[in-house]
């Protein structure tokens, strides 16, 4: 992890969360719902009991950690929260304490540093919105595989290339304005630009309208993570499959991701996009990944990809 990325998350823990709100609500990221993990990652055959071990790799302010720990608290399962940012860890720990969660171990380290510790293997690894911020994402994935149980499952999220085009173009637009400015100055500039966006700007379309920009202007960590991150890359559907293969993994299924539309499993099914029977017949004759790649380009509305990864031939395919 680069020095700039470390500094960003120390200054702006992400996502913005208030531990006091744990008294009133529980955030439940669907990718980390254990019944779903069991279905797609283990064909429904995994016993989620006291021996179940989950790792949240790049836990941020704790959304996935809290939800996994809540699901495992009664059966005795354990969660390891891995995060290099002390500021983010402070928020995450406070959230867990507010809920009385005692089945969490906190580790302040990068993915590579943690893998080098050779910990006991994990049944499920969450790594959402992290690998695409590494200078070598494939190395990061290989490090995760090194701590994954033989029959384990990884739930990952990567930025989507086509649905994120508005952000890509924004980053190109402001690139010449960033040198010489510290992060606070970059943020002030970005807030000024966002406050007077032309009606045709692609960010408005990507976010669904003015309400998206209003929400951004009320959430500095979101602005920084979305528009000012110093290291990021994005993937199309074929890129996701190739990325998985680089670490010897299969894409078991695409799934939904908390807080975003257009990324559920149904959005990768051509039957949900195409009604012309002749076109549908031609598409159905293609390999699955080609069908899914068509859906991504046709919808142009997938800003990210959430998916489960397993080792080849470990899990029978499921619907």
Annotate each PLM feature.
Residues 11-16, 21-51, 67:
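Conserved alpha-helix/loop element of class I SAM-dependent methyltransferases that forms part
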Residues 100-113:
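Conserved SAM-binding strand-loop segment of SAM-dependent methyltransferases
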Residues 123-136:
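A short SAM/SAH-binding and catalytic strip from SAM-dependent methyltransferases
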Residues 61-75:
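Conserved SAM-binding loop of SAM-dependent methyltransferases across substrates and taxa
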Residues 153-205:
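Conserved class I S-adenosyl-L-methionine
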Residues 202-319:
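Rossmann-like AdoMet/SAM-dependent catalytic core
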Residues 138-150:
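A short glycine-rich, Lys/Arg-flanked "PGG" loop and its adjoining helix->strand segment in the class I
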Residues 115-125:
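A short acidic, Gly/Pro-enriched loop at the edge of an enzyme's catalytic core
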């Amino acid at each position: 992890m680069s020095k700039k990325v470390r500094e960003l998350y120390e200054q702006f823990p992400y996502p913005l969360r208030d531990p006091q709100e744990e008294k009133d609500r529980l955030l439940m990221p669907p990718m980390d719902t254990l019944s779903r993990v069991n279905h797609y990652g283990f064909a429904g055959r995994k016993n989620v009991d006291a021996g179940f071990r989950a790792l949240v790799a790049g836990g941020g302010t704790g959304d996935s950690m809290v939800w996994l720990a809540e699901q495992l608290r009664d059966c005795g399962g354990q969660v390891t929260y891995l995060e290099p940012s002390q500021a983010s860890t402070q928020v995450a720990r406070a959230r867990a304490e507010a809920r009385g969660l005692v089945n969490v171990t906190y580790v302040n380290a990068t993915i590579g540093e943690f893998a080098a510790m050779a910990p006991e293997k994990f049944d499920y690894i969450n790594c959402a919105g992290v690998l695409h911020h590494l200078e070598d994402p494939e190395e990061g994935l290989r490090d995760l595989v090194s701590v994954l149980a033989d029959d384990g499952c990884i739930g990952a999220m990567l930025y989507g290339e086509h649905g994120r085009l508005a952000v890509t173009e924004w980053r190109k637009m402001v690139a010449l304005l960033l040198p010489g400015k510290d992060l606070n100055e970059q943020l002030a500039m970005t807030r000024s630009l966002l406050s007077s966006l032309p009606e045709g700007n692609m960010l408005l379309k990507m976010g669904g309208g003015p309400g998206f920009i209003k929400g951004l202007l009320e959430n500095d960590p979101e602005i920084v993570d979305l528009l000012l991150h110093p290291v990021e890359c994005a993937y199309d559907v074929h890129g996701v499959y190739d990325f998985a293969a680089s670490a010897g993994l299969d894409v078991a299924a695409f799934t939904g991701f908390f807080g975003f539309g257009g990324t559920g499993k149904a959005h990768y099914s051509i039957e949900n996009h195409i009604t012309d029977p002749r076109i549908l017949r031609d598409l159905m004759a293609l390999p699955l990944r080609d069908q899914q790649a068509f859906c991504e380009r046709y919808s142009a509305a997938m800003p990210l990809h959430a998916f489960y990864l397993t080792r080849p031939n470990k899990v029978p395919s499921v619907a």
